[in-house]
Amino acid sequence: MVEKKVKYSCIQSLKDAGAPVIIVTLPEEAEAIANACRDNGITVSAFCDNETRKSSKLFCGLEVFHTPTLPKRFPKARFIIAYYNIQECVEQLSALGYDEFYSPLELLENYDVSKYQHRISQSYMKTRISVWKKSHELYFDEAKIYLRSLDVMITTKCSLKCESCANLMQY
């Protein structure tokens, strides 16, 4: 069992004085997370992302840093993981010397999409948040293992003879 380093309860901890708060990665949901932080009195200092092209412009009025460069600018920081793959972010940031991670699930529990004008349509944002929430909820569910995708490779000739089969070795 992998140790869970990400905390579910975040609002009070992030409101308290401490290291800067940074939102990790820039999926469309990051905009909703930034809005929810403002609604809850949490000051976000910046965003970070692994794609250098995203760090060349502002997002939601805040600077975006290339993740590997964070330690130069922020020796200590608290991170809100906006990415669907929480563990991947935690591993990368832990390797950079960080140890304070939060899921924004608590922030988005009562988030009202219709209250804001997003960069994408309201219905699409609502759907994105719904799917995103499921991946974060599964991270905290001890009874389940979350796999975002699963590749199946058939290595022998299939004998099912399905009518609409796309397998190259069908029959």
Where do the PLM segments sit?
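Hydrophobic, well-ordered beta-alpha structural blocks that scaffold small-molecule cofactor pockets
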Residues: 1-135
